[in-house]
A protein has these predicted regions:
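N-terminal amphipathic/basic-hydrophobic helices that include classical n-h-c signal peptides
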Residues: 1-13
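Short catalytic-loop micro-motif centered on adjacent basic/acidic residues
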Residues: 138-140, 212, 325-327
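Active-site/acyl-donor-binding loops of N-acyltransferases
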Residues: 87, 150-182, 273, 321-383
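Aromatic (often tryptophan-rich) hydrophobic motifs at membrane interfaces
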Residues: 94, 104, 115, 124-128, ...
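The substrate-binding groove and active-site-proximal loops of carbohydrate-active enzymes
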Residues: 109-115
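Short, high-confidence coil segments that cap the C-terminus of an alpha-helix
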Residues: 63-65, 118, 132-135, 266, ...
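Histidine-centered acyl-transfer/condensation active-site motif
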Residues: 126-130, 136-141
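A conserved beta-strand-loop-helix scaffold within acyl/acetyltransferase catalytic domains
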Residues: 12, 16-99, 142-302
């Protein structure tokens, strides 16, 4: 008991929590955020400064997204963690308004940016101080199954007042890059590979077919404009879902892309026919992991599958000295599953922090479980 009390005191004594508006994010905090990333427990593009700040600025009305900030109470008040969060209404799994990690139509992964040496302490401070800031629960969508944060959340004691609830899980295509990337092409079914090669030959009959990869600061503004134009010229432009369809989407994309480009974490792969880009893939690279953010192709050549030809060439040119893994960032059922055999587990869950809300949540879940059991028994009896 004494040891637990001392641990509790240390959490409160050496770290605090605050909730900031976008207007309160200073240049100093931005610099600290950037410096925290190499020290983070988990890091992927969608919790990094280069994505999160443009999203907060461009995709939401003022005040919708807040920044949860952990600081150590040392002489420098060192930054220990940040996560943008937004309010969400009550739902059956959580019978009161709560918060969730910022989610956008362009966020295939969720998480928190926490210092690797202080992550457990940060979660304890969130448990203690979060309710006082109005954060009674925090939903985190699509956590990677191998993330350090998920491991810590799943290991939390299931005590009244605070616990981690897994709401759902899913899988998507993922790729571990082998030492010999040729193995990846050999792993594709003979029938599928034959079909891809036939399309490639037919397309090459129309002119010189070329593939190229451009990374970091070498990515040009012309390439970014080409990608945007390709996406907007297809069905996404017609449906109003392209990045160019609305000014705030375009502003977000341009600000975000330039930030990743300057950091050397942007990568484009392109398929060209007679020198003209007919497929473009916009990717990020962080911690030796690649992420496919968006793909676009010229629908004039749809019968040849230029998008999948672009991805096949990417597989053929993978460099295991540069990248260890690739995340497709797609929904289940994507065509990429035919050429990427591995799957990544993604978990969406809620960290409940308020004792009264926790008790109500547990009661609701027990009731729902009882209803399912009774329904099953009735169906069995009727059958």
């Amino acid at each position: 008991m004494a040891a637990h009390f001392q641990t509790w005191l240390s959490h409160l004594r050496f770290m605090d929590l605050s909730l900031l508006l976008l207007s309160q994010i200073t240049p100093l905090l931005i610099a600290e955020w950037l410096s925290l990333e190499p020290l983070a427990l988990d890091l992927h593009p969608f919790i990094s400064l280069s994505f999160a700040l443009p999203a907060m600025r461009q995709l939401f009305e003022p005040g919708v997204v807040r920044l949860l900030v952990w600081r150590r109470l040392d002489a420098a008040r060192s930054l220990a963690g940040v996560v943008p969060i937004m309010a969400v209404p009550a739902r059956w799994t959580l019978p009161a308004p709560s918060w969730q990690v910022m989610s956008t139509p362009y966020s295939p992964l969720g998480g928190m940016l926490l210092h690797r040496d202080h992550a457990a302490q940060a979660l304890e401070v969130l448990r203690r101080q979060g309710p006082g800031l109005g954060v009674s629960a925090l939903q985190i969508p699509d956590l990677p199954g191998d993330s350090g944060l998920l491991q810590r959340l799943e290991a939390l004691p299931n005590r009244l007042g605070t616990h981690w609830i897994e709401d759902r899980r899913r899988e998507r295509a993922f790729l571990d890059v082998p030492r010999d990337p040729a193995q990846l092409l050999q792993g594709i079914s003979r029938k599928k590979m034959g079909e891809i090669r036939r399309r490639q030959r037919r397309l090459a009959e129309r002119g010189g077919l070329q593939w190229r990869e451009t990374a970091g600061a070498e990515v040009t503004s012309e390439q970014i404009e080409t990608f945007l134009a390709l996406e907007n010229a297809g069905w996404k432009g017609e449906s109003g879902s392209s990045l160019l369809a609305l000014p705030h989407r375009e502003r977000f994309f341009r600000e975000m892309a330039e930030s990743f480009r300057q950091r050397g974490e942007l990568l484009l792969t392109e398929l060209l026919l007679e020198g003209r880009v007919i497929a473009s893939q916009f990717c990020f690279l962080q911690r030796r992991t690649g992420y496919i953010f968006k793909s676009a192709y010229d629908e004039t050549y749809r019968e040849f599958g230029p998008g999948i030809l672009n991805k096949i060439e990417q597989l053929a040119h993978l460099d295991p000295s540069q990248v260890d893994r690739w995340d497709s960032c797609t929904q289940s059922g994507s065509y990429i599953e035919e050429i990427w055999p591995q799957r990544q587990r993604l978990v969406t869950g809620t960290l409940v922090l308020n004792p009264a809300l926790d008790a109500g949540t547990r009661l609701l879940r027990r009731g729902r479980s009882l209803v399912r059991t009774m329904r099953g028994q009735l169906l069995t009896a009727a059958g």
